[in-house]
């Protein structure tokens, strides 16, 4: 929304654009780009002056804004006063004391941010949100598609308050399409995308990669998309609504297997601890 999507076309062949990329790189010169936020002093971090309102929760969303905060962006994280973030219960815990303020995973994911708890059922809390939207360069959310609209904070509504707003919506399967309302955590999207089918032993059920795999992949794409949108706004003055499917982002890490299927008609299967390229490779008694 807010920009013209690129027309769909086939994937590039190996080396097809190498000469073009090298020519563009050589012609780019050594000039450093201007910062995307307010002009910082020379000692400031590169994203100093960028202001982000963060409605995200769990891991895949907040990890993206944590990266931007580490590079100097000012991030205000809004959490529900009635439904705390579930990763507050994530291990490990400080001094092995279980509690909403002792979970290391939550604090690691939200370091370098300002935190604010609001009850959006209260009119005064909604006014606080709108004030923050006016302040922000970027609004981020990671709810099931439609949740922000039901709260009255969809992109079109927020754009009326802040016309140049960049908004990122990231969810398991994206904002549109037949699976868009399928909500869950990264282990579910890893299974849907195909990581589980390729991980494990050939004579057993699929086991999948450790953890909620796409939760660790998608934040990098989210952070890059936000930076690209800010650069575009600097050049054009226009905001944009970014739609990031965490499942689609993770497909990039299946690219070798997908190319093997489409180009070589291969049938990737689970191979335990073996490696298709290296030998000997495996776990052996010593």
Feature annotation, model-predicted:
Residues 217-227, 244-263:
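Active-site-proximal catalytic alpha-helix in oxidoreductases
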Residues 9-241, 270:
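N-terminal helix-loop segment corresponding to the beta1-alpha1 unit
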């Amino acid at each position: 929304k807010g920009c013209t999507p690129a027309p769909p076309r086939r994937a590039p062949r190996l080396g097809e654009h190498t000469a073009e990329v090298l020519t563009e790189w050589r012609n780019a010169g050594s000039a450093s780009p201007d910062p995307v936020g307010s002009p910082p002093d020379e000692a400031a971090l590169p994203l100093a002056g960028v202001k982000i309102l963060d409605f995200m929760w769990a891991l895949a969303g907040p990890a993206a804004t944590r990266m931007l905060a580490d590079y100097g962006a000012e991030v205000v994280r809004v959490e529900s006063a009635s439904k705390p973030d579930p990763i507050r219960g994530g291990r490990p815990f400080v001094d092995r004391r279980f509690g909403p303020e002792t979970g290391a995973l939550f604090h690691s994911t939200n370091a370098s941010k300002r935190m604010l708890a609001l009850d959006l059922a209260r009119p005064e809390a909604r006014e606080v949100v709108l004030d923050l939207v006016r302040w922000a360069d970027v609004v981020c959310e990671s709810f099931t598609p439609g949740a922000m609209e039901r709260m009255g904070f969809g992109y079109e509504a927020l754009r009326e308050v802040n016309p140049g707003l960049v908004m990122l919506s990231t969810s398991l399967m994206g904002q549109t399409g037949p699976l868009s309302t399928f909500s869950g955590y990264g282990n579910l999207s890893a299974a849907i995308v195909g990581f589980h089918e390729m991980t494990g032993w050939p004579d057993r059920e699929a086991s999948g990669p450790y953890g909620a795999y796409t939760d660790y992949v998608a934040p990098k794409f989210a952070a890059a998309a936000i930076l690209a949108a800010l650069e575009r706004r600097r050049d054009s003055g226009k905001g944009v609504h970014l739609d990031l499917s965490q499942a689609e982002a993770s497909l990039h890490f299946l690219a070798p297997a997908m190319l093997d299927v489409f180009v070589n008609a291969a049938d990737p299967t689970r191979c335990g601890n073996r490696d298709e390229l290296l030998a000997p490779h495996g776990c052996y008694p010593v």
